[in-house]
């Protein structure tokens, strides 16, 4: 472990736990996908997973500390994945309110993103979490190198937007910290699964009216300590199992 890896240690531990659980819940994809967490006020200093390492093996000491404004990042030893840099660097540079950014190609979110109509209607409590809180990117332009990353970041300027359904691609989830963001990612995948399975029945959907969907979303926004308790329990499970995620 070098000196850099001693910085933001608790934040690294939280990210490592999120990677481990994303893999356990099958929200990962080979050695692709990426999570990041800003550690300064303007969001330009951020932590992110190393290039080409499986989520199930990432430890706190593996996580990179990057500067979104450093033009030489990709030429340095141990450079991040170029699409991770293009997407997350752009979001942290342009959207300082997005403290934590999680991008995956999880199965149900990606199925939703592959439909001609990628809207997520409020048909239960979990889908209602995201009512009027997501944006659909319908302009997929290839891999998320710098230009594509900047285009995506331009759609996330409104702090109310917590999820980007990335058409033909996957999902991008934003939050205030690791627990908030991972909890949102977990529930988005569950919500997408519920919707996809409901569509598979071929039966009409029981969609909530606008006022009830909006009320439910607001109530869930304010639900006390749910994300923190969820993530604390996930870390406790890893600790009980003797996982090395926090090393």
What do the predicted segments below correspond to?
Residues 1-247:
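Glycine-rich flexible loops
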